[in-house]
Amino acid sequence: MKKGLGTFIKAILAGFCIGLGGNVFLALLNTNKMLGAVLFSVGLFTICTHSLNLFTGKACYILDNKPSYLGTLCIIWLGNLVGACLMALLVHLSRLNASYTEAAQSLVATKNADSLGSLFFLGVICNSLIYIAVDGHKSNPHDLGKYLALMLGVTVFILAGTEHSIADMYYYAVAGELFTGQGLLRLVIISLGNVVGGLLIPAGKKLAAALGA
């Protein structure tokens, strides 16, 4: 119970950090999307530096854990949701509310107009890049390489137009459309796509190793 609560708290902090990155992306969405995508990486940088629990990152390591890890992932997902909502609440209580809400609503409108299949596959693509980012940070022996992996992975997934479930939690919350049937359904579909995407490269590596490569 105590461990589960600690996991949940670290997940709340991770969702909050993704909201931090989402803030700067919304601020620059209509003026300098490239810079916004680069600076969004402050969220993942903070998460990896402080060993926080981000659903999209942790999903990449399902194959390295016991089946009970899936329950831990559900706790992390819920914690990320709480953290993203906390950041959205702070935005709504500030002078940033109007401009950020307008920007978030434009992003959410695109997602709501998309098909569930498209959102799933965009989630797959996104978390393939997140795996590159987090595993690069984990395994690269050089500090510069660690942080380049994070920055490049995040920047590419944003500019490519893919779907990150926790960032989307934040955008839906700011747009005021999170707790609707449509919003929650899309988040679940994107989350499932993220799980599949996070497993593609590690599963491929394990298969290649099993075949003697």
Residue ranges and their predicted role:
Residues 1-213:
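Alpha-helical transmembrane segments and their helix-helix packing motifs
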